[in-house]
Design a protein with these regions (language model features):
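Glycine-rich phosphate-binding loops that contact phosphosugars or nucleotide phosphates
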Residues: 1-108, 117-121
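Alpha-helix N-cap/loop-to-helix boundary motif
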Residues: 97-105, 109, 128-135, 139
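Short, amphipathic alpha-helical interaction segments embedded in low-complexity terminal/linker regions
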Residues: 117-202
Length: 202
């Protein structure tokens, strides 16, 4: 889940004063159901945005793990972070326009974190996104290619396995790799906690 100063509408219409609303941050996190054991990543290019700072404090009170991402050497949000990340990208070409270098740098770090999380959750096999949802024709074709690349199967065999596995690329890969039926592949994957590599090596 993600919360931001000003709410979702602030994505499309600027609400500059909302970043100073400390109470809103606490309320937003409560509504999001944040609890002990969760992870909160606080982003503020300046390292001192009141909304983010308040959210970091709330997370610490709840016993959540905290990561801060700022673009300055000395920040306030880092004081409340278990893992402070400071991206020293230097001044913006347009003074104060942190959507440029700072925003881009923060987005790159978020990409790294989310990609790592995907790997740790078993959504990746080798370098393939095996847990994608084939919600359009492009993704249906990509899913077939993923099964082919992971197993060495031809298109016909990959498609057959996907149909038998209710379009689950993970199950189709395990099925082909182990030479078993769809139900056995599903069971092997369940025993492996959703990790394709573990399911194949059981």
């Amino acid at each position: 889940k993600g919360v931001m100063a000003g709410g979702p509408e602030a994505m499309y219409r600027a609400k500059e004063n909302s970043e100073d609303d400390e109470d809103a941050a606490r309320k937003d996190l409560e509504e999001a159901g944040m609890k002990k054991g969760d992870l909160l990543i606080g982003l503020a290019a300046s390292g001192q945005t009141p909304y983010v700072l308040s959210g970091m404090k709330k997370a610490k009170e709840e016993g959540a793990l905290t990561i801060s991402i700022s673009c300055v050497e000395e920040d306030k949000i880092g004081e409340y972070a278990d893992i402070p990340i400071r991206l020293l990208c230097g001044p913006e070409i347009l003074t104060g326009s942190t959507r440029l270098k700072a925003g881009t740098a923060e987005k790159m770090v978020l990409n790294m974190i989310s990609t790592g999380a995907f790997v740790l959750c078993g959504k990746v096999y080798e370098n393939l996104m095996v847990d994608l949802i084939p919600s359009n024709s492009k993704l249906v074709k990509r899913e077939t290619r993923i099964v082919q690349e992971a197993t060495g199967a031809d298109e016909e065999e990959a498609e057959k396995a996907l149909r038998e596995c209710s379009r689950s690329a993970k199950e189709a890969i395990v099925m082909i790799k182990l030479g078993c039926d769809a139900e056995s592949a599903k069971l092997a994957l369940k025993k492996a906690g959703g990790f394709v590599r573990k399911a194949i090596k059981q």
